[in-house]
């Protein structure tokens, strides 16, 4: 599942459109993950027991997540190196199960498609999905 030159161009062009709404997309994607996959709330229990998509910390962290995806777009030619610090943080300090990266990627795709339905063509879907799966693999790199 490597990214072709066309995939990379497609991801970059779509990110240019998404970036202005990335905080909202990230907050909604994280909120959806917490509702649809309630076991993921365990990683955020320090925010309190009322974790829901409208919780200010969910929205704030969603923006941080999308900042990480933006960093990945900038490092699209070497995701492992570009995301090594984030991989180390999630593996050794936060101890996040790397399976959650794919769950979150699914929710980011879903919300991005909702925000940009005309731009989210099947070709964009394929390229963004491949990209986010590569991001998930890069984030899991330090777990090995």
Swiss-Prot record:
O2 binds at residue 61. Pfam families: Globin (PF00042). Residues 2-144 form the Globin domain. PROSITE patterns: GLOBIN. The keyword Metal-binding applies. GO terms for cellular component: blood microparticle; haptoglobin-hemoglobin complex; hemoglobin complex. Disulfide bonds: none annotated. Belongs to the globin family. Involved in oxygen transport from gills to the various peripheral tissues. This is Hemoglobin subunit alpha-B. The lineage of its organism: Eukaryota, Metazoa, Chordata, Craniata, Vertebrata. The gene is hbab.
């Amino acid at each position: 599942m490597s990214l072709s030159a066309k995939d990379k161009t497609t991801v970059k062009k779509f990110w240019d459109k998404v970036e202005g709404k990335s905080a909202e997309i990230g907050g909604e994607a994280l909120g959806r993950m917490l509702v649809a996959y309630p076991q993921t709330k365990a990683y955020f229990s320090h925010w309190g027991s009322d974790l829901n998509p409208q919780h200010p910390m969910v929205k704030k962290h969603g923006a941080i997540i999308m900042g990480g995806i933006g960093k990945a777009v900038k490092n699209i030619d070497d995701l492992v190196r570009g995301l090594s610090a984030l991989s180390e943080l999630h593996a050794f300090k936060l101890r996040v199960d790397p399976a959650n990266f794919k769950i979150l990627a699914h929710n980011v795709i879903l919300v991005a498609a909702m925000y940009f339905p005309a731009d989210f063509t099947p070709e964009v879907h394929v390229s963004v999905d491949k990209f986010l799966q590569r991001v998930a693999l890069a984030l899991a790199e330090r777990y090995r």
